[in-house]
Amino acid sequence: MKQLSSAEVRQLFLDFFKEKGHTIEPSAPLVPNNDPTILWINSGVATMKKYFDGSVIPDNPRMANAQKSIRTNDIENVGKTARHHTFFEMLGNFSIGDYFKEGAILFAWEFLTSPKWIGFDPDKLYVTVYPEDEEAKTLWREKIGLSEDHIVEIEDNFWDIGIGPSGPDSEIFYDRGPAFGDDESDPELYPGGENERYLEIWNLVFSQFNHNPDGTYTPLPKQNIDTGMGLERMVSIIQDAPTNFETDLFMPIIREVEQISGVKYGHSQENDVAFKVIADHIRTVAFAIGDGALPSNEGRGYILRRLLRRAVRYAKVLTINEPFMYKLVPVVGKIMNSFYPEVENQTDFIQKVIRTEEERFHETLNEGLAILETILKNAKETNEQTIKGADIFKLYDTFGFPVELTEEYAEDHGLKVDHAGFEAEMKEQRDRARSARADVKSMQVQGELLANLTDKSEFVGYNTTEHVSEILYLIQDDTLVDEVASGSEAQVIFKETPFYAESGGQVADKGTIESETGVAYVEDVQKAPNKQNLHRISVKEGVLKTGDTVKLAVDKVKRRETIKNHTATHLLHRALKDTLGEHVNQAGSLVSPDRLRFDFSHFGQITEEELTKMEEIVNEKIWEQINVIIEEMPIAEAKELGAMALFGEKYGEVVRVVQVGKYSIELCGGVHVRNTADIGLFKIVSETGIGAGTRRIEAVTGKEAYRFVTEQENTLKQTANLLKTTTKETPQKVEQLQADLREVRRENESLLSKLASAASADIFESPEEIGGVKVIAKQVNAKDMNQLRQFVDNWKDKKIGGVLVLGAVQGDKVNLISAVSEDAIKAGYHAGKLLKEVATRCGGNGGGRPDMAQAGGKNPAELGTALDYVSTWVKEQQA
């Protein structure tokens, strides 16, 4: 077996399959592009779904990739086992209707055992198969020459993710030898069992069935191959490392943590877990941020925050008590740079995000500690013996407090923790995360009709909006038909078409179709699996037939407005980077006739000054009357020019480059203006946050921009008229009105306070005495909770003491407040517990501290009865 670095193993794999006629697909970003079924790209096949379900036909049916991936369903095990990771690389080869089981098995065996490639000893390799897959068993036995004792049948060897392609699989295992397990009585000591001796290195999935929505399985029109090899596992075998963490993918990170902490790796199991957690999590966080994700409280941003906080918590085991994770980013970049340059290219930005998050977490830990102390204090005051699971979960989820830390503090106070309650809260959170995506189909059932339509259809709409063409195919209800009549809908493929198919954010063209026998309207245009433009039409008159000569006419007005917005989007993209920084990446867009929408990654708020600057830049480029040059060139040449690519998009060897002078250069297949002056005017309509680290700008151009400005001007004029001033002086007039309003409110609050004080004389006169405790429970006139609190303040000022409960009716609701003096608290009275009982008696709920609480009710008619209960409650406390 060769001695190889991780980079060499990765490259050998890709070189092998390139030699076997495979196209090497680039690794896609970790943030999925247009796939709502997953938070992260979590496998090599995740980027290939469109090929497997037949919605897109690849140029080459043989493909291979090295795909960076994230899986976070088992975070708590990372660091505690030899091979659990949140970030990993999956090496895979794929066949879409080309070679099948025999080809996949022969390729895998050659790569693993040939001295030219990996050179494993064949005797150390075992395989597992699905019991009913006789074909695979025969191939392993007869084509490869494996003996029966090296072929293991396992019932779970069937790959099925629900609706879509599925099939049996065959896993390849490497025997690491007796040093990793030699107890023959161990029921798990076999390839496929839970042991460290037989290590799975490659899974070959034979997709041969459609799993249909009704639960049945039918043969696929085209059989596929999907394989996955974990790079980290392969490297651990080749480098003879006890675990994945002792390979060259992790050890440089661990060595850097040793330098920061002054603690050595390999001397303590507890310390080693911390080293492994940090080494794993920094890889995940660095790559995810580099691919556009940012820490937040939701979705993938929440996962990043959780990973960072978990690493920081474990760092305390290594006596690291200050921000440090950001210092590891350059190490990650250096390890991975030969194949993944994105971390090294964005080191400064990634470090900035991580350091900010670390600093925030150290502050949050202190806040969490303060809350924990309050929880412990309240538990002791109420004689509770256990910290509630909900409280433990809140500390864990919001403040990053590990359960173990909460448990230590609880033990110091003689308390226990509710582990079962905590686990129930964790399960609820996991269920919520699953249900958020449960109704989204992860893959479609593989179709046959469109995939078999291979005649080429040329798009001619870059240079014209009208064209005479021929109908190649008419489709109704997934069936090819010869004609479609008036009043019906159909799908059409033409020999040539000027109609743009929706892609790259630009909406599809609309327009008309005319033949000698019929007229139809184009409602929508999408890409068919074989890259033809597929038109959805409604027939308005007569009949359209296959083979008809037709006149195609794009709606020129809509097209003209759309292309203004598309070129403006390119200008905005560049202006965003110039204003906010090069870290800005496109996260989605919409280019339609009436507006444009641009989503982008950014980790902070955008100021009015920044928005104004971006808008000015775009308009300056419009008024400079810059020619828009569009040409096709090799992708290498485009990259040398500095062309921006759509984040997450895959491109061929020849690309279409759209250049707006020297200001904006992008790879784009859309339609654009010839000169920026054609845009006329650009106006930002709104800027909002739409998710974790993602913001959205909506804007208009041309006539729509003029209309927007005119509407704003009219609104300003109307406001000025109402204020009896000029438009120029409207801001000063509004400021004066706000100042006047603040003064009126101040005077009103003062008056209410005086009224409350005056009313208090009657309310607090002659309190009821129960067992030596003064009790006041009355209905009062108070417009809101603030006024009720003023009554409580007056009660405290008068030093009446005892127990106070006040209620007020506001419309169809009840406001309640209670207070208990310090001496009454010592006697065992609790304002929060009292008010909870009172509130339930008038249709509400609430609670609070021992000294003060407030609540609401929904049944004003029962307020009197609820207040009468106060005396009863006080007597019960004395019993």
From Swiss-Prot:
<dbReference type="GO" id="GO:0005829">
    <property type="term" value="C:cytosol"/>
</dbReference>
<dbReference type="InterPro" id="IPR009000">
    <property type="entry name" value="Transl_B-barrel_sf"/>
</dbReference>
<comment type="similarity">
    <text>Belongs to the class-II aminoacyl-tRNA synthetase family.</text>
</comment>
<keyword id="KW-0648">Protein biosynthesis</keyword>
<keyword id="KW-0436">Ligase</keyword>
<feature type="binding site">
    <location>
        <position position="566"/>
    </location>
    <ligand>
        <name>Zn(2+)</name>
    </ligand>
</feature>
<dbReference type="InterPro" id="IPR018164">
    <property type="entry name" value="Ala-tRNA-synth_IIc_N"/>
</dbReference>
<dbReference type="GO" id="GO:0008270">
    <property type="term" value="F:zinc ion binding"/>
</dbReference>
<dbReference type="GO" id="GO:0004813">
    <property type="term" value="F:alanine-tRNA ligase activity"/>
</dbReference>
<keyword id="KW-0963">Cytoplasm</keyword>
<dbReference type="GO" id="GO:0000049">
    <property type="term" value="F:tRNA binding"/>
</dbReference>
<feature type="binding site">
    <location>
        <position position="570"/>
    </location>
    <ligand>
        <name>Zn(2+)</name>
    </ligand>
</feature>
<keyword id="KW-0067">ATP-binding</keyword>
<keyword id="KW-0694">RNA-binding</keyword>
<keyword id="KW-0030">Aminoacyl-tRNA synthetase</keyword>
<dbReference type="InterPro" id="IPR045864">
    <property type="entry name" value="aa-tRNA-synth_II/BPL/LPL"/>
</dbReference>
<dbReference type="GO" id="GO:0006419">
    <property type="term" value="P:alanyl-tRNA aminoacylation"/>
</dbReference>
<keyword id="KW-0862">Zinc</keyword>
<keyword id="KW-0547">Nucleotide-binding</keyword>
<dbReference type="InterPro" id="IPR023033">
    <property type="entry name" value="Ala_tRNA_ligase_euk/bac"/>
</dbReference>
<dbReference type="InterPro" id="IPR018162">
    <property type="entry name" value="Ala-tRNA-ligase_IIc_anticod-bd"/>
</dbReference>
<dbReference type="Pfam" id="PF02272">
    <property type="entry name" value="DHHA1"/>
</dbReference>
<feature type="binding site">
    <location>
        <position position="672"/>
    </location>
    <ligand>
        <name>Zn(2+)</name>
    </ligand>
</feature>
<dbReference type="InterPro" id="IPR002318">
    <property type="entry name" value="Ala-tRNA-lgiase_IIc"/>
</dbReference>
<dbReference type="InterPro" id="IPR018163">
    <property type="entry name" value="Thr/Ala-tRNA-synth_IIc_edit"/>
</dbReference>
<dbReference type="InterPro" id="IPR003156">
    <property type="entry name" value="DHHA1_dom"/>
</dbReference>
<keyword id="KW-0820">tRNA-binding</keyword>
<dbReference type="Pfam" id="PF01411">
    <property type="entry name" value="tRNA-synt_2c"/>
</dbReference>
<feature type="binding site">
    <location>
        <position position="668"/>
    </location>
    <ligand>
        <name>Zn(2+)</name>
    </ligand>
</feature>
<dbReference type="InterPro" id="IPR050058">
    <property type="entry name" value="Ala-tRNA_ligase"/>
</dbReference>
<dbReference type="InterPro" id="IPR012947">
    <property type="entry name" value="tRNA_SAD"/>
</dbReference>
<protein>
    <recommendedName>
        <fullName>Alanine--tRNA ligase</fullName>
        <ecNumber>6.1.1.7</ecNumber>
    </recommendedName>
</protein>
<keyword id="KW-0479">Metal-binding</keyword>
<dbReference type="GO" id="GO:0005524">
    <property type="term" value="F:ATP binding"/>
</dbReference>
<dbReference type="GO" id="GO:0140096">
    <property type="term" value="F:catalytic activity, acting on a protein"/>
</dbReference>
<dbReference type="GO" id="GO:0016740">
    <property type="term" value="F:transferase activity"/>
</dbReference>
<dbReference type="Pfam" id="PF07973">
    <property type="entry name" value="tRNA_SAD"/>
</dbReference>
<dbReference type="GO" id="GO:0002161">
    <property type="term" value="F:aminoacyl-tRNA deacylase activity"/>
</dbReference>
<dbReference type="InterPro" id="IPR018165">
    <property type="entry name" value="Ala-tRNA-synth_IIc_core"/>
</dbReference>
<comment type="function">
    <text>Catalyzes the attachment of alanine to tRNA(Ala) in a two-step reaction: alanine is first activated by ATP to form Ala-AMP and then transferred to the acceptor end of tRNA(Ala). Also edits incorrectly charged Ser-tRNA(Ala) and Gly-tRNA(Ala) via its editing domain.</text>
</comment>
